[in-house]
Amino acid sequence: MSSGRLLLGATPLGQPSDASPRLAAALATADVVAAEDTRRVRKLAKALDIRIGGRVVSLFDRVEALRVTALLDAINNGATVLVVSDAGTPVISDPGYRLVAACIDAGVSVTCLPGPSAVTTALVMSGLPAEKFCFEGFAPRKGAARRAWLAELAEERRTCVFFESPRRLAACLNDAVEQLGGARPAAICRELTKVHEEVVRGSLDELAIWAAGGVLGEITVVVAGAAPHAELSSLIAQVEEFVAAGIRVKDACSEVAAAHPGVRTRQLYDAVLQSRRETGGPAQP
């Protein structure tokens, strides 16, 4: 195995004092510091009163694939390479994955210097269940892709965490109301650990209204998982009760679905029609 090694250093989200002693030592002693933004890492070092001892190179998304060979060669020649992103932990929706994978394939030592992460910070501050969760990275930029992505998450039982641009937050929340249901609990975490840190909690309906006026800063969204479904037969029975009272099937399905987060109107409607076919009930709504 090479005598060199790869270090993954978690950097502060906003407060330089959140930097760990191990990160500070690595900044001072690493032979190469591969940074998502070289200006940001130099600014951090200055705030920590540290002189970066090694060579500083950029490692952002568009150049990572081009940097892997040279950085791996340096490690194989005995260098310690430190990877840092702008804020938080490298690799998690930030550069570093390709280099980590290449180092593992080459039998190179990979070590993480743990520390800040917007994902876990938002999760624990959200007030939502945290024993099981999933991280979805950045929400898709385009509306159609975003709605399809949210539709796939509609049945997810775990709490979901994802990043979103402040410019697209309002549109994303409106799509979430449509795909997940407006009653779904959620939290918007803004500017975590910074002077203007803010966590706004409420239903997706409430948060969509809040975001409509515009939001600034770094955004992490946390959304509760889907509630356990009531038995499908019970939901169908509730729909038929509404229908017996004179309500149209589609409207009855909407009413029942709205009362059970995670249940989608169209799926329930299809289930009602299927049940009617199987039991010889009226085929038409």
From Swiss-Prot:
SUPFAM superfamilies to which the protein is assigned, alphabetical: Tetrapyrrole methylase
Main location: cytoplasm
Reaction equations catalysed: cytidine(1402) in 16S rRNA + S-adenosyl-L-methionine = 2'-O-methylcytidine(1402) in 16S rRNA + S-adenosyl-L-homocysteine + H(+)
Enzyme Commission number: 2.1.1.198
UniProt keyword Transferase, yes or no: yes
GO cellular component, one term: cytoplasm
Subcellular localization(s) per the UniProt record: Cytoplasm
GO MF, one annotated term: rRNA (cytosine-2'-O-)-methyltransferase activity
InterPro entries assigned to the protein according to its UniProt record, in alphabetical order: 4pyrrol_Mease, 4pyrrol_Methylase_sf, 4pyrrole_Mease_sub1, 4pyrrole_Mease_sub2, rRNA_ssu_MeTfrase_I, SAM_MeTrfase_RsmI_CS
UniProt keywords, alphabetically: Cytoplasm, Methyltransferase, rRNA processing, S-adenosyl-L-methionine, Transferase
Induction: Up-regulated 34-fold 7 days after infection of human macrophages.
Uppermost EC category: transferase
Function recorded in the entry: Catalyzes the 2'-O-methylation of the ribose of cytidine 1402 (C1402) in 16S rRNA.
Alphabetized PANTHER family for the sequence: RIBOSOMAL RNA SMALL SUBUNIT METHYLTRANSFERASE I
Family annotation (HAMAP family): 16SrRNA_methyltr_I (MF_01877)
Family: Belongs to the methyltransferase superfamily. RsmI family.
Name of the protein described by the UniProt record: Ribosomal RNA small subunit methyltransferase I
The organism of origin for this protein: Mycobacterium tuberculosis (strain ATCC 25618 / H37Rv)
Record gene name: rsmI
